[in-house]
């Protein structure tokens, strides 16, 4: 019985389609992983420029469903076909694999004003379901770096999408290259129920 504040079709599309989110990020200058455009034909011309390792994921699934890590062409082709088989959308994301800690960053929005609410570290539990996280905590030594490097561009993403009221969040990785990259956004309360 939680409210849905999404009054913009664009906001809903960006929050539920990872490809549209990435396009909007690129438009406003928010950092995202390098990606590769592939079609179901998986032609030699498409595959020859891919630099491994990559991540393959459907644009319309959450909780890491359909996501695969690929070190070579054979793994990429199999992962692409798998992601395509479980997706309702013909677009599949193939992007550079990022390595580093993951964060969920929550914002509160009121009358178009956007404020960072909390910055939480996510630690997945090896050996458990792929969409299971064991620990989420709000204290992080990386908050200042995030604010300095990414916070303003995330606010631009929300504004450009038409997010004006409610709660929104982004998931991000601090890659081993020392920079944050945005993964996806939500325009709703998060599933981990940290608002309770």
Residue ranges and their predicted role:
Residues 83-89, 97-140, 148-182, 186-194:
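Phosphate-binding core of ATP-grasp and ATP-grasp-like enzymes
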Residues 26-117:
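Rossmann-like NAD(P)H-binding beta-loop-alpha module
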Residues 8, 58-62, 189:
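Short, histidine-centered active-site or binding-site loop motifs used for metal coordination
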Residues 70-73, 144-151:
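Electropositive phosphate-/nucleotide-binding environments in soluble metabolic enzymes
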Residues 1-45:
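Conserved N-proximal alpha/beta basic substrate-recognition cap immediately N-terminal to
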Residues 13-19, 66, 127-129:
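Short, charged, surface-exposed secondary-structure boundary motifs
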Residues 8-12, 138-144:
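A short acidic, glycine-rich active-site loop
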């Amino acid at each position: 019985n939680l409210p849905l504040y999404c009054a913009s079709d664009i906001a809903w599309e960006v929050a539920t389609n990872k490809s549209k989110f990435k396009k909007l990020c690129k438009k406003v200058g928010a950092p995202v992983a390098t990606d590769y455009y592939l079609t179901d034909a998986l032609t030699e011309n498409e595959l020859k420029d891919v630099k491994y390792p990559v991540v393959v994921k459907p644009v319309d699934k959450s909780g890491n469903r359909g996501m695969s890590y690929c070190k070579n062409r054979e793994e990429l082709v199999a992962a692409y076909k798998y992601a395509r088989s479980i997706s309702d959308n013909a677009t599949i994301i193939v992007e550079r694999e990022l390595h580093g800690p993951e964060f969920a960053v929550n914002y509160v929005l009121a009358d178009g004003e956007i404020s960072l609410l909390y910055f939480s570290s996510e630690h997945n539990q090896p050996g458990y379901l792929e969409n299971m996280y064991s620990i989420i905590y709000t204290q992080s030594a990386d908050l200042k770096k995030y604010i300095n490097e990414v916070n303003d561009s995330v606010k631009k993403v929300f504004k450009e999408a038409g997010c004006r009221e409610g709660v929104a969040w982004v998931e991000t990785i601090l890659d081993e290259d020392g920079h944050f990259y945005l993964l996806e956004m939500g325009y709703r309360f998060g599933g981990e129920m940290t608002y309770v």
